[in-house]
Curated annotation (Swiss-Prot):
Assigned keywords, A-Z: Amino-acid biosynthesis, ATP-binding, Isopeptide bond, Kinase, Nucleotide-binding, Threonine biosynthesis, Transferase, Ubl conjugation
Top-level taxon in the UniProt lineage: Eukaryota
Knockout-associated phenotype: Threonine auxotrophy. Leads to accumulation of toxic levels of homoserine. Sensitive to thermal stress, cold stress, high pH, sodium chloride, lithium chloride, UV, caffeine, 5-fluorocytosine, and compounds that increase flux through the threonine biosynthetic pathway (including tacrolimus, amitrole and sulfometuron methyl). Decreases survival time in an in vivo model of infection. Double knockout with FPR1 is lethal.
UniProt-listed Enzyme Commission number(s): 2.7.1.39
GO biological process, one term: homoserine metabolic process
This protein's name: Homoserine kinase
Length: 357
């Protein structure tokens, strides 16, 4: 019997305002996997060591450089981890995965998180494991241990999340693949052993309301910035007053984004940050000027502005004048010789999905 299904996983923006490693929002830009399993086509997947033929649309981000071996690609490495945790060595015979990825790589829009979520769902579906989203989240968080992007991509909407501490024994297994956000070897080694199942409830989250009038403008510079490099510039310790600054604004922002009408006088200052953005200005030319000079008083409709994830993408929340706001930020990047594109997005309220075909 031939099986076919489509997996869709949204991009995400994390570190919203003061919510470093806490707040994330799923965005209406989707990684898509078209999957078929047909044992009569097994000869077409024999070149792959794990029975999976992987391909990408030519329009996909990273089309010319993304690895196509199932044990090297992050999506399929993740799926193999799920399978092997459940004592299944390989993909079913004749598995084909065709990927369409419009999410820019290394720009702070959750491309790695989307790949991990897609991979966990792929493993769950091909083996018909029947996991809930909450259980799949545990698998995701073993691989990418930053719950803000992962939770927003899996669950959708505007989320706050935290990750409980894991023991060294729980995270040191070589079979666990590691996403690109961590400055470590890629993991996912095939030791021939059955990896232990992930602990349950590794991450906890809540979904906040979001005023639907608020749109997300992503201004995307044409250069990549790895999360590992971006984390490398952060200090090991912070002044107490900087942590209090963020905590105060975090408490206000999660409610301010639900209010109707949106209040720029409340949201704009509540989206300020002292934990990561000041330290990343050396990696993103023009960042300080952009965050301080593009304001609601100069651009009506603008509510707030921040780095998206680790950057370099800028996330601006607004209710109108989207093109004018985008062009101003693009022009400021251009002063530093950096070209940009921009996208107008909305929250992806439902998160990741599977459609049987």
């Amino acid at each position: 019997m031939v099986r076919a299904f489509k997996i869709k996983v949204p991009a995400s923006s994390a570190n919203i305002g003061p919510g470093y490693d806490v707040l994330g929002v799923g965005l209406s830009l989707f990684l898509e996997l078209d999957v078929t399993i047909d044992s009569s086509q097994a000869q077409e997947t024999n070149d792959d060591p794990n029975n999976c033929k992987l391909s990408y649309t030519k329009e996909s981000e990273g089309y010319s450089t993304v690895p196509l071996r199932s044990d090297a690609n992050l999506i399929t490495r993740t799926a193999l981890y799920v399978l092997r945790c459940n004592n299944i060595r390989n993909f079913p015979s004749g598995t084909k995965v065709h990927v369409s990825n419009p999410i820019p790589l290394g720009r702070g829009l959750g491309s790695s998180g989307a790949a991990v979520v897609a991979g966990v769902i792929l493993g769950n579906e091909v083996a018909q494991l029947g996991f809930s989203k909450q259980r799949m989240l545990d698998y995701c968080l073993m691989i990418e241990r930053h719950p803000d992007n992962i939770t927003a991509a899996m669950m959708g909407g505007f989320c706050g999340s935290f990750l409980r501490d894991l023991t060294p024994q729980e995270v040191e297994r070589r079979e666990i693949p590691l996403a690109e956000v961590l400055p470590e070897p890629s993991g996912g080694e095939d030791t021939g052993l059955v990896p232990p199942l992930p602990p349950t409830d590794i991450g906890r989250h809540v979904k906040y309301q979001w005023n639907p009038a608020i749109k997300c403008i992503a201004i995307i510079p044409q250069f990549e910035l790895s999360t590992a490099d971006s984390r490398g510039v952060l200090p090991k310790a912070y002044p107490t007053q900087d942590l209090v600054f963020n905590l105060q604004r975090l408490a206000v922002l999660t409610t301010a984004l639900t209010m109707d009408p949106p209040n720029a006088d409340l949201i704009y200052p509540a989206m300020q940050d002292r934990v990561h953005q000041p330290y990343r200005k050396t990696l993103i030319p023009g960042l300080t000027e952009i965050l301080s000079c593009v304001t609601p008083s100069t651009y009506p409709g603008l509510l707030g502005i921040c780095l998206s994830g680790a950057g370099p993408t800028i996330l601006a929340l607004a209710t109108e004048n989207f093109e004018e706001i985008s062009q101003e930020i693009i022009n400021r990047f251009a002063k530093n010789g950096i070209k940009c594109s921009w996208k107008l997005l909305e929250p992806a309220y439902d998160g990741a999905s599977v459609e049987q075909q």
